[in-house]
Amino acid sequence: MIGIIGGTHILEIKVLKDVEETRIETPYGTAEIDVGRVDGIDVAIIQRHGKRKDKPPHRINHAANFYALKSLGVKYVIGMGSVGALREEYSLPSLIIPHDYIDFFSGVTIYNDSLVHVTPGFDEYLREVLVEVARKISSFPVIDKGVYFQTRGPRLETKAEIAMIKSFADCVGMTAGSEATIARELGLSYAIVCTMDNYAHGIKNQSIDYREIVEKAKENARECLKIVEEAVKKVWEEKIQRT
């Protein structure tokens, strides 16, 4: 079984067959998961903001989500996300598969009662799969590496914050760093493909409208999911079916 974690629109795009909605109790809380099949492959999908879309980024229970996936036998987790572009030269919409991230603020961990230090990062195998698939089938420009800067949310960033972080990163979002950290702590492989749906605050001389960002993300989510579906098939063939 392969895990998929997506944003607010993933469950609106009907990709799963034989869907079973389930709630899994974990040591970190309850996770809601849709289990089903994509092209005959067993997958487990989590909507990171909850079925009711009522969990803002700073309140997502990443530990419960990833622990629940692991309890189902998932070893590989592919994320989908929406990010703001930190480079004026990027065209919109684009896809970016980040190779690293900066997350100074979330502090997420499963190790609250023990002293354990992991070396965080995205899984390079999954990243390479996403890059290969995106280059082959995406109709969007593909940015095959970049640094993802995670802010706490739920508010958007100030112009001053963007002016600072654009020196260190290529895109800005609110969840992928936390997901990558928890995945690594639980021994799961994780990488993410993101749609660039807007320019971050101050990158271009234009106002930022959250409702417009949401609409753009919804429009572009299908392209992102197309990549994820093909990546799921490739991971299944190369890493699961052969074992």
Swiss-Prot record:
Keywords: Glycosyltransferase, Purine salvage, Transferase. Phosphate binds at T8, R48, H49, T175. Its EC number is 2.4.2.1. Substrate binds at M174, N198, Y199, A200. CDD domains: MTAP_SsMTAPII_like_MTIP. One of its GO terms (molecular function) is S-methyl-5-thioadenosine phosphorylase activity. It is an enzyme of class 2 (transferase). It comes from the Archaea. One of its GO terms (biological process) is L-methionine salvage from methylthioadenosine. GO terms for cellular component: cytosol. It catalyses: a purine D-ribonucleoside + phosphate = a purine nucleobase + alpha-D-ribose 1-phosphate. Pathway: Purine metabolism; purine nucleoside salvage. InterPro entries: MTAP, Nucleoside_phosphorylase_d, Nucleoside_phosphorylase_sf. Although this enzyme belongs to the family of MTA phosphorylases based on sequence homology, it has been shown that conserved amino acid substitutions in the substrate binding pocket convert the substrate specificity of this enzyme from 6-aminopurines to 6-oxopurines. Purine nucleoside phosphorylase which is highly specific for 6-oxopurine nucleosides. Cleaves guanosine or inosine to respective bases and sugar-1-phosphate molecules. Involved in purine salvage. Belongs to the PNP/MTAP phosphorylase family. MTAP subfamily. This is Probable 6-oxopurine nucleoside phosphorylase. It comes from Archaeoglobus fulgidus (strain ATCC 49558 / DSM 4304 / JCM 9628 / NBRC 100126 / VC-16).
